[in-house]
Amino acid sequence: MARRVLHISDCHLVAPGETLLQTDTEATLRAVLNQAVDEAAQDGCDAIIASGDLAHTPTTPVYERFLHIVSDYFNVPMLSLPGNHDVLQAMQQAGMSMAPIVWADWHLQALDSHEDDRPKSLITELDRQAAAQGLAQGAAHWVLLATHHPLVLVDCPWLDKDRIVGPLELMNWLNAASQQRLCGAVFGHAHQEVAGRVGAWPVFGVPSTCFQFRPRSPKFAIDDKGPGYQWLDLSKDGKISRTVRRVAV
């Protein structure tokens, strides 16, 4: 059967009462979830992918608050990945999990591309093996990969230096590990809508739930687009379609 997945990223949650770049990141996250849950009431939601930089103040209480906020709107499985602003140990202490979400037809698999407090992607051999072990857990027909860092250039030089190196080799390796079931990938980090391909695989970057980075900017710059998220529609024949949504705040 078809699956519908909500993809959020780069929430940058801070301590209560604080803001980041003049943005109340809890308010923008709640605005995203409030709109998304209304859409889910019509079209459904089977799971959530939260692809990193979920906290900007990366403490266990902030991650616990993130989980509480999400649970105010949704009661579905969530695949949670760390980003470069996250601290994996604090996420794990809060109960956030990179364990795969597996149905009979689709398998949502995380690949950790982060290193605590460093912007550049880092995928170690242990990260690869963890993903391979996750892929071995299920026999779903199709696999969707989730990372934090981009798998393609986003045409922002200051961001592109942090992208995943050797994406085609990586995707080929993961496809082999999944017994040729890999259908595509999603990522965060770029704070903007991205669509591209790595070899034959479609890859989709999602806007941030808070502020956006200006597309095609050679240096750090904030865009005027609103908070965003994307719906991933996973068909029973292995196709992935996505719909980007924005909220007005």
Tell where the protein language model's regions lie, with residue ranges.
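Alpha-helical scaffolding within the catalytic cores
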Residues: 31, 89-99, 131, 190
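N-terminal active-site segment of His-dependent metallophosphoesterases
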Residues: 1-65, 154
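Acidic/histidine-rich helix-loop elements
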Residues: 6-30, 56, 87-94, 117-125, ...
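Active-site glycine-centered loops adjacent to acidic/histidine catalytic or metal-binding residues
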Residues: 10, 52-53, 83-84, 148, ...
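Metal-dependent catalytic neighborhoods of phosphoester/phosphodiester hydrolases
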Residues: 18-19, 50-71, 87-97, 121, ...
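His/acidic metal-ligating clusters that form di-metal
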Residues: 32-47, 119-204, 238-240
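Binuclear metal-dependent phosphoesterase catalytic core
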Residues: 2, 20-23, 31, 173, ...
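Active-site-proximal beta-strand elements of phosphoester/diester hydrolases
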Residues: 3-15, 105-115, 144-148, 201-207, ...
